[in-house]
Amino acid sequence: MGKFKFPSAYTILFFLIAVVAVLTWIIPAGQYHMAMNEALGKDVPVAGTYAHVAAHPQGLVSVLMAPIAGLYDPESGQAGAIDVALFILIIGGFLGIVTKTGAIDAGIERVTTRLRGREEWMIPILMALFAAGGTIYGMAEESLPFYTLLVPVMLAARFDPVVAASTVLLGAGIGTLGSTINPFATVIAANAAGIPFTNGIALRVALLVIGWIICVAWVMRYARKVRQDPSLSIVADKQEENRAHFLGNKDAQTLEFTPVRKIILVIFALAFAVMIYGVAVLGWWMAEISAVFLASAIIVGLIARLSEEELTSTFINGARDLLGVALIIGIARGIVVIMDKGMITHTILHSAEGLVSGLSTVAFINVMYWLEVVLSFLVPSSSGLAVLTMPIMAPLADFANVNRDLVVTAYQSASGIVNLVTPTSAVVMGGLAIARVPYVRYLKWVAPLLGILTVVIMVALSLGAVL
């Protein structure tokens, strides 16, 4: 009998869609009354208004339609995750063209030469940059291109794809967990809770700094072990395969870091800088930043003097490389679609509301944290979870004599830690797919770190409740 092989990300997500569909036949359907929140510009649930509604069980057709509905609603035509999927394909084309020019490989050689003997210091520096993106604007889907960039860098430095993936995922993730001015988490949640988002910022900064130190130490410890003994890598059996995929025959010759390649890397960096500025300052999202990378791909192709045929075929091949990631994003969003159409999202939320009433301050805030953890698995969108839960959960804090800002911190900490591992997150599944790191292996590797971070969060929340 053959050895059991864990299913792919696609199978896991389809299985979760089926499980949630079954739950729509078991969990009673219900809904809160929704009212417009002028500050948010969205309808939000009103506490105390939950009522049962007619059941909307989801069947086989709904399960099969879920990945499609995850990309766009076939009934209304409203976009779902299709903008993110298209962004991924355009990023793939852009990276394909940049890679074709040899600029990335030449740049990698220059970086590794300059950092020879101290490559591990890339880890804290890069994790600090990603954490800044997380805490400032909730860096998520836009972090996916960095996986493709960093894996070859880390492999050339004698690390493994896990080091590259965790540098991005844990870096941006701990930043989001300790969000300070993140408009998609802290600001939305605080507005929904009826408080200024600056309330409680000191505790969030403390969580951010402590969490970053812990994550950096975890990744650097693993990186040193792998560098000293590659057999200790959790993907050691894929070492040659990964080197062939990400580095190709790079070792066969030294690429000259020509002025043209330098210009291409400058454009490469500027594209990401413009993306970050546009999202954080100008309010851009997927359509605008997709256009940035499309324009950048054309500019790079012209500078590299690629022919029209070379440019278009290279772009298409690059997009093809990330097609699987784009599909994962649609499937992951399909889980939430089934929950919403089955009318069980608010029922689960109502059960959570009943559990937190009448508790002590410390018990309340920790129960709140764990409830948000459970809900975060079902609603991986931080802004969606904020709009869904804060209007109901924050008023409950008044009865427990807990400051509302602490509820906001509990929410974003729970959402942040879950989104480091949840299989419903396109960032987790997509990032690991790009780095070719099996999800279950990553989960086992990161589990002790999650335990440490959870203890830190619960201690911080408890201190915040009693001080």
Annotated model-derived regions:
Residues 1-6, 10, 34-43, 202-314, ...:
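Long, contiguous bundles of hydrophobic transmembrane helices that form the permeation core
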Residues 2-12, 147-237, 254-258, 262, ...:
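Membrane-core helix-loop-helix motifs of multi-pass transport proteins
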Residues 7, 356-467:
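C-terminal transmembrane helix pair
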Residues 9-10, 14-18, 43-106, 284-347:
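Core transmembrane alpha-helical segments of multi-pass membrane transporters/permeases
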Residues 10-28, 88-96, 129-133, 175, ...:
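Hydrophobic core segments of alpha-helical transmembrane domains in multi-pass membrane transport
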Residues 75-85, 113-125, 157-163, 262, ...:
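Membrane-interfacial loop-to-helix junctions in multi-pass transporters
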Residues 85-88, 119-134, 159-177, 209, ...:
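Alpha-helical transmembrane segments of multi-pass membrane proteins
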Residues 88-90, 118-149, 329-339, 355-395, ...:
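Hydrophobic alpha-helical transmembrane segments of multi-pass integral membrane proteins
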